[in-house]
Amino acid sequence: MRNSMSRLAVIFGMTLVVAVPALADVTFKKQTLSERFVAEGCDLADFDKDGHVDITAGNTIWHGPDFSRRTEFTPPADNPSGPTKTPYDPAKGYSDYFLAYAHDFNGDSWPDILVYGLPGEAAHVFVNPQGKAGHWEKHAIFDVADGESPDLEDMNGDGRPELLVHSRGQLGFAEIDWKEPLAQARFRPVTPKSPENDKKYFRYTHGYGAGDMNGDGRPDLLTKDGWFEQPADISKDTIWPFHPGPFGLADAPRGGAHMEAYDVNGDGRADVVTSYDGHGYGLGWFEQNADGTFTEHRIMGSKPEDNPQGVAFSQLHALRLVDMNGDGLADIVTGKRRWAHGINGDVEPNAPPVLYWFELVRDGKGGATFVAHQIDDDSGVGTQVTVGHLDTDGKPDVIVANKRGVFAFFQQ
């Protein structure tokens, strides 16, 4: 369950039309909301219930429809030292706002904001004051949210989301008590506690997701090493059966970002779509065969010749599957996270921070390819990329927040 399907001066109203040389006639208009580093995650919702979608990143809400008005829902951070020292330094530091998700947590019909801080820190919900002025109440609802790509997904089938995180060396998710939604969520481990797992599943582990891999209607857990099958009864904590992948490369063992389960080639079986290394190269989909094994189909590698359109970029630290062109097939939206580890960290840290969508094209014979289309070359992704509707034309738009700023891309 994703709500996305909701310099010192801040610059408003800057627009740029970016033509996409695509097979599909898709173009985007770029609007720069801020050129400051405020966050690496963002989301959208109608926070003030005026009928227009708004954007949140960091401690700020930009109000639609033109996003020229902004308000702070919580005071600016005042961190004298550490990795999130303020003001946030894009060349050296990080933000307290790693990812953000909009959802009505307390059931009053007003969207609240869930913020994941740095990996291993607490997850907080900021409660919407129902349109009243002032800062929003802050509630810590989970104390140790590990992993670099936490999410918000319905894992138990009750129609309401859980925190898709792992914690203290165990994979799983955190279940919210909807009678007391702002209290501490209960962690539901699916792997055993062990010294080996403490090293394997730690605060900076990359690659995590959920999706129904075996067609039983229950979401399973995805990792770079394989998938964990949800049992029919999860009323009590239990170890979930593991099915090996792996979903990556031997020379890129770190893992990517958000992982997705989707029937890419239309054969009725769920496949896995993922980036390979959140701080390196690689994007691909892994076809599930009839016997449960997987065949890799690489979409993009480290060299232009690895991709039919000659596209190659590194640090794919956020990914979503969304139908971008209305053909009924889910496409990939991803890009480059700039300066993830500073100006000299990782590979090609100063290459253009690009933002792309990869169009899924099926051949009708069980095969499929993804065609690369550039959206922008001066933004990229953060640790999150959000796709939703910013206007009323019905076409999916894209928003990102990262060390370059905060940007909205309106599909034309």
Q: Which residues does each predicted region cover?
A:
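Beta-propeller-forming repeat regions
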Residues: 22-412
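Bacterial N-terminal signal peptides
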Residues: 9-19
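N-terminal secretory signal peptides that target proteins for export/translocation
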Residues: 1-6
